[in-house]
From Swiss-Prot:
SUPFAM superfamilies (alphabetical): XseB-like
Purpose: Bidirectionally degrades single-stranded DNA into large acid-insoluble oligonucleotides, which are then degraded further into small acid-soluble oligonucleotides.
GO terms of molecular function: exodeoxyribonuclease VII activity
Name of the gene: xseB
Name the UniProt record assigns to this protein: Exodeoxyribonuclease 7 small subunit
Species lineage: Bacteria, Bacillati, Bacillota, Bacilli, Lactobacillales
Chief localization: cytoplasm
Top-level division of the source organism's lineage: Bacteria
GO biological process: DNA catabolic process
Length: 78
């Protein structure tokens, strides 16, 4: 099984995909493949960020109970 890439590696790969597509000098078939790859990477990155946000919004109280911390999100989540 392949080793899972880090968030930073996926982000760098997505940036490269976007750069390739912006240049516009690649064949249509490759552009479609790159676009699909970019969508998949974007989805993976969003999931990683969502999980990180869930982790960061939990605060341990003195008695050891977890409570959610309201960071004033803009309502785009769930």
């Amino acid at each position: 099984m392949a080793e899972e890439k880090t968030f930073e590696e996926n982000l760098q790969e997505l940036q490269q995909v976007v750069s390739n597509l912006e240049q516009g000098d690649i064949p249509l078939e490759k552009a479609l493949t790159e676009f699909q790859k970019g969508i998949q990477l974007s989805s993976e990155l969003q999931e990683t960020l969502k999980n990180a946000e869930k982790t960061l919004t939990k605060v341990m109280q003195d008695n050891g109970e977890e409570t959610n911390l309201d960071l004033g999100t803009d309502g785009e989540n769930e």
